[in-house]
């Protein structure tokens, strides 16, 4: 079941994935206050109706598209539903993602971390490309801080030896950062801009809900002790800033501040191999 909007009051449309909780919900609320008509994408119908209702009550405009981004077919179905609602998209927030402890596979046979964090944003962006071009859109891919030694092996990210947990999550977010740089190179001339955003570590969100129990308990504590936590309001404002202000196409924004992308993300050979892998799967 899909929830359609009342008459949109804005001629700017923002699509936000993972919009039914946590960072995605906060971003959707903040962007609606900036005048965007929100297309909220999520799996949970009840949570989705709640966020749409909250936006409407605040005087904004929103609608819900429910679907599962864990498979290419599911992601394509979400894209098709979005395109049935609008012909122009001005902002796409690829926020849906997660870290998984168990080494379970999707119905497509792919490791879940890769399927949700890399393949889904690629399939969705490609499927919406004409509508994004019509809106001269900005695409914001949500990534994370990347250690200097993070893997750029396709086999480690998407192959049979892909690992679960945070190691896989970081490697896949590096792949998404690489894809951001590559998509800017490929589609920038169409009037599109692509940026990668690490919005900060946000205690209390549902991120990592399938991660090891010990990591779930001590991760937020360690983050707080070393001073790398942010509030939901701070993170939401970072989405607004990179989504609406002047940015460097292909840039990596760490907590909203432009930083040089890790060298791995600028590796053209890895970028080409990654895109070939994604095109074969999507």
Regions found by a protein language model. Give the residues of each.
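Catalytic loop of short-chain dehydrogenase/reductase
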Residues: 5, 97, 101-102, 111, ...
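A glycine-rich helix->loop->beta "capping" turn
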Residues: 9-10, 58-61, 81-94, 100-105
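Conserved glycine-rich cofactor-binding loop
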Residues: 20-21, 44
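Conserved glycine-rich Rossmann-like NAD(P)H-binding loop of the short-chain dehydrogenase/reductase
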Residues: 34-50
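Rossmann-fold cofactor-recognition segment
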Residues: 56-73
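Active-site Tyr-X3-Lys motif and surrounding loop/helix of classical short-chain dehydrogenase/reductase
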Residues: 73, 77-84, 101-103, 108-115
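C-terminal helical subdomain
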Residues: 220-263, 268-272, 276
């Amino acid at each position: 079941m899909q929830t359609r909007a009342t008459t949109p009051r804005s001629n700017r449309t923002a699509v936000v994935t993972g919009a039914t909780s946590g960072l995605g919900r906060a971003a959707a609320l903040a962007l609606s206050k900036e005048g965007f008509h929100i297309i909220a994408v999520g799996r949970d119908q009840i949570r989705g109706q709640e966020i749409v209702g909250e936006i409407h009550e605040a005087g904004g405009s929103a609608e819900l598209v429910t679907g599962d981004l864990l498979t290419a077919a599911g992601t394509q179905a979400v894209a098709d539903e979005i395109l049935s609602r609008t012909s122009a998209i001005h902002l796409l927030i690829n926020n849906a993602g997660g870290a998984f402890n168990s080494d379970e596979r999707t119905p497509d046979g792919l490791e879940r971390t890769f399927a949700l964090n890399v393949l889904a944003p690629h399939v969705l962006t490609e499927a919406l490309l004409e509508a994004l071009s019509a809106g001269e859109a900005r695409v914001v891919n949500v990534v994370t801080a990347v250690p200097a030694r993070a893997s750029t092996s396709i086999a480690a990210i998407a192959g049979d030896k892909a690992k679960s947990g945070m190691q896989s999550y970081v490697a896949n977010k590096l792949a998404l950062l690489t894809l951001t740089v590559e998509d800017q190179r490929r589609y920038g001339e169409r009037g599109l801009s692509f940026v990668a955003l690490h919005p900060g570590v946000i205690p209390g969100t549902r991120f990592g809900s399938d991660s090891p129990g010990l990591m779930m308990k001590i991760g937020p504590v360690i983050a707080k002790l070393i001073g790398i936590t942010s509030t939901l309001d701070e993170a939401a404002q970072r989405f607004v800033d990179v989504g609406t202000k002047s940015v460097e196409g292909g840039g990596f924004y760490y907590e909203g501040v432009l930083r040089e992308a890790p060298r791995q993300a600028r590796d053209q050979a890895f970028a080409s191999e990654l895109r070939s892998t994604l095109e074969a799967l999507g």
